[in-house]
Amino acid sequence: MTALYSVIKFKIIELIKSGKYQANDQLPTESEFCEQYDVSRTTVRLALQQLELEGYIKRIQGKGTFVSAAKIQTPIPHKITSFAEQMRGLRSESKVLELVVIPADHSIAELLKMKENEPVNKLVRVRYAEGEPLQYHTSYIPWKAAPGLAQEECTGSLFELLRTKYNIEISRGTESIEPILTDETISGHLLTNVGAPAFLSESLTYDKNEEVVEYAQIITRGDRTKFTVEQSYHS
């Protein structure tokens, strides 16, 4: 038997999808929903909590509950693509938070197939879609592969920069994705509540000589993202 709060949740989702409630519209109050659906406040509160966790609505203290903007559909590509390409025509940009050279610790050295304490470029960026922070992106690039990286060069495609400045031809990559909850630092940069749902992507990128040229950790807002996969069938 379906829980009553789930029924209310799906009713509200249908109203959002039908256009009755549009992005940034204020929703009725809890008591108004109680009267509308003839249910208890606890039921309505549970439904709204689920809608917030799933990214359909957002609560602003002292103002009320509002419909969130539509989620950005991000394809899981079969080839390596830039952030701008993944945004499929949305206005995208990057802000560099940090670019430093650090000694590789044990875990970074293993991932980049180098010796401990060898120099590594650490690049931290926030990626924006339509002016809204979407990703917190940390890249580790062997210094010997890309010496002299400049901060002003790193606001566009990193792989294009590696190709044009350092003659590095990207060949392939591996990527894993798992759900996480944001901590205080990530939430501050992505403008979410602490403990908000997000996706952690970890990737390794190789050049044509099978050298690792980047290890990346990308944290993507869960309330603003929907991943899609295109599949084919062969009998």
From Swiss-Prot:
Keywords: DNA-binding, Repressor, Transcription, Transcription regulation. Residues 30-49 bind DNA. Disruption phenotype: Deletion of the gene improves the growth rate on N-acetylglucosamine. InterPro entries: Bact_HTH_transcr_reg, Chorismate_lyase_/UTRA_dom_sf, Tscrpt_reg_HTH_GntR, UTRA, WH-like_DNA-bd_sf, WH_DNA-bd_sf. The keyword Acyltransferase does not apply. Transmembrane segments: none annotated. This is HTH-type transcriptional repressor GamR. The gene is gamR.
